[in-house]
Amino acid sequence: MMRGSTEIDMPESSSVSKGTAPLIAAPMKEKGGYKKGIAIFDFILRLAAIATALAAAASMGTSDETLPFFTQFFQFQASYDDLPTFQFFVIAMAIVAGYLVLSLPFSIVAIVRPHAAGPRLLLIILDTVALTLNTAAGAAAAAIVYLAHNGNSSTNWLAICQQFGDFCQKNSGAVVASFITVVIFVFLLVLSAFALRRH
């Protein structure tokens, strides 16, 4: 007579190691790591804006041309300080460039602490003010440069750029540089808005 084999389930002893779960979860990577990349790009754009703003102010501020012919009583000369609009342009672009230089430490703080909202909020407010000043100066100077190139027959304003070519070329370059600075400011404001998002 054969004995039937029986299986007996034995409980595992306490010495057998079971799978253990860690009591403290591993720290997850903090969300919003893209904010540091935005802050670095913001810093680079500010350096570019400093260059364009200084170029605009320097180009306009050094625009001076004297025609080689003159009479006994008249000397034909054109300079930026002959027009208050161009004087305003030089002063405004110098202020914008100075502000951009002073904003660099705040941009560095935003790189070191990308989740800090205070410096970013301050920059977005001051950038808006600087953008307004920059746009006003560029638009005013652009109107005068347009008249210098084309004149206005209704008011008998003659185009002077045929005679003062170098003067008009420098002024036109300054206006273009100022509007490049405007575009950079718009990008800075968009970046700051993205950086202030909570999610």
Swiss-Prot record:
One of its GO terms (cellular component) is Casparian strip. This is Casparian strip membrane protein 2. Residues 59-87, 142-173 are extracellular. Residues 1-37, 109-120, 195-199 are cytoplasmic. Homodimer and heterodimers. Belongs to the Casparian strip membrane proteins (CASP) family. Regulates membrane-cell wall junctions and localized cell wall deposition. Required for establishment of the Casparian strip membrane domain (CSD) and the subsequent formation of Casparian strips, a cell wall modification of the root endodermis that determines an apoplastic barrier between the intraorganismal apoplasm and the extraorganismal apoplasm and prevents lateral diffusion. It comes from Populus trichocarpa. Keywords: Cell membrane, Cell wall biogenesis/degradation, Glycoprotein, Membrane, Transmembrane, Transmembrane helix. The keyword Heme does not apply. Its main location: membrane. Glycans are attached at N152. The lineage of its organism: Eukaryota, Viridiplantae, Streptophyta, Embryophyta, Tracheophyta. The chain crosses the membrane at residues 38-58, 88-108, 121-141, 174-194.
